[in-house]
Swiss-Prot record:
Protein name (database record): Thyrotropin subunit beta
UniProt cross-references to PROSITE patterns, sorted A to Z: GLYCO_HORMONE_BETA_1, GLYCO_HORMONE_BETA_2
One Gene Ontology MF term: hormone activity
Domain of life: Eukaryota
Principal location listed in the UniProt entry: secreted
Length: 147
C-alpha cells in the first residue's frame, strides 16, 4: 500500500512538471540610447512557457478561490551590464539587463514582477545602425536568487 501511495505521489509531481513547461529561452534585445550612435543586439534569456491555470466560468465569491492564475516568471535571475558604443563622454554608456537562470510558475506579484506587457505590433526595431556583437563586462556576476 505504501509503495502505491509513493508511486502516486511521484507521478503527481512529475505530472505537475509536465503540465507546467516554463523555462529559460533565448531572446535578443535591441537597445539604443538617443544620445549614442548605434543600436546593439544583446543576447539574453527570458522565462517563457505554459503554466497550468484554471478560470471557472461561474461568477461568485466562493468560485474565486478555485481560480488558479499562474504565469511563467523568474525564479533566479542574474543582471549583466553591456557598454553601448558611440556614446558621447557625458552619457553613461552602460545598460543593465536580466538573464533568466531558472524559471517557475507562480501567481504574479506586482511588487516584484512585471505582470503585464504589451508588445508593439512592429516588434523590436532599431532607428540607428545595428552592431551585432555585445558582451557583458568580463567576470561580472550579479546573481539574484528569488523564491
Amino acid at each position: 500500500m505504501r509503495v502505491v501511495l509513493l508511486a502516486s505521489g511521484v507521478l503527481c509531481l512529475l505530472a505537475g512538471q509536465v503540465l507546467s513547461i516554463c523555462s529559460p529561452v533565448d531572446y535578443t534585445l535591441y537597445v539604443e540610447k538617443p544620445e549614442c550612435d548605434f543600436c546593439v543586439a544583446i543576447n539574453t534569456t527570458i522565462c517563457m512557457g505554459f503554466c497550468y491555470s484554471l478560470d471557472p466560468n461561474v461568477v461568485g465569491p466562493a468560485v474565486k478561490r478555485l481560480a488558479v492564475q499562474r504565469g511563467c516568471t523568474y525564479q533566479a535571475v542574474e543582471y549583466r551590464t553591456a557598454e553601448l558604443p558611440g556614446c558621447p563622454p557625458h552619457v553613461d554608456p552602460r545598460f543593465s539587463y536580466p538573464v533568466a537562470l531558472h524559471c517557475t510558475c507562480r501567481a504574479c506579484d506586482p511588487a516584484r514582477d512585471e505582470c503585464t506587457h504589451r508588445a508593439s505590433a512592429d516588434g523590436d526595431r532599431c532607428s540607428k545602425p545595428l552592431l551585432l556583437h555585445m558582451h557583458a563586462y568580463p567576470g561580472q556576476s550579479n546573481h539574484i536568487q528569488t523564491l
